[in-house]
Amino acid sequence: MNIRMRSITIKKCLVMLLLIISSNISIAQDCLDTESYYQYIKNNGQPHLEYVLDKIRSHSVVSLGEDHWIDVHPQFLCDLITASAQDSTANIDAVAVEFGSERYQYLADSLIKSPVYREDLVFKILQYTPDDLGNPYKEYADVFKSVWENNQKKPENLRTRILLVDPAYIQDYFDGKDYVYTGSRDDNMFDIIRNYIIKRSHIVFYAGASHTLARINGTRQGDYYYNWPSAGFLLKSCYPQDVFIINLWGGQMGSKGYIENNQTRWNLIADGVIDKAFQKNGNKPVGFDLKDDFPLLRTETYFANPTIKLSNYGEKGSPYAKEQKLSDICDGIVFIKPVSEFNGIQLINIYDNEFIEKANKRTKGSCKTAEDILKTVKEWHPILQF
């Protein structure tokens, strides 16, 4: 190779190297400094219940994103319902929950109208949730009870309704029946909640974070991605001034529940950098907005999970961009208490004979009793407690 050709080759290599370096620099790096998060929380935080009540006063929809299968988040919802009932300026017109099929909305309405608490109606609702064997969870049942009990203390025009927002056809799908697809689960959530925004009502939308956050979700199918908008994305896109999205702080979630860790009990988000900031703040329950000056935390880091890989960030067709920040899909955070103090949700027997027979068919004969069902649910999610 002559000197001229060698010089051209070297120049090309240098150009390629500069392009690679510049592309990496263009993706901002996460802030992994506990002190920065602590100062932000100290300067911007307020008591967690009052924080959410303020958002209810100023928005039609306040979305609360929970971690499934743990006790603290639905317990917080119960506390919020009680606090709202004591302040008519922050009254909740309806609580929209993921754990209930719209097919059984009449049961939720019957509960609200009943002069006595009807646990049988609640258990019936929890049998027909978007899980094959229902949601036999005490803390979910407590949400219904909290709404009913607090309604007894309020005038009828201020009573809170419970909205069941999972589409009806899901139950037919579980049973192997023919069904009419009416849209995704997120589409259905959006359709129901939108009707209340139009009425200028105040709604608390409580569901898993994959539904409440304003993001596009996706899974790889064959050679490309199947992407769909979350209910939070649809709500925030259509009504940006009316919807406020809060994520409830928690641990690192796997497909079966929180991921165990010998040092911290559960794997912590971003290796515990922000949890240490909460600790430095006295582990006080706190809520705060994710403003422009919130230390940078990318969604890839926030949702990092060593046990599963749903989609590659930055891959062609993937809805997950490496540069996407948590503040792009979420408006605020509520910290309740240290994640190490979180426990699995408590299993309870909600099953009647009709559903046990249905569950036995759904599991091809492996769930013949309520005890069999609870044992199976526990096997699916070992974090759950008896």
Feature annotation, model-predicted:
Residues 27-386:
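Compositional signal for N-terminal targeting/processing segments
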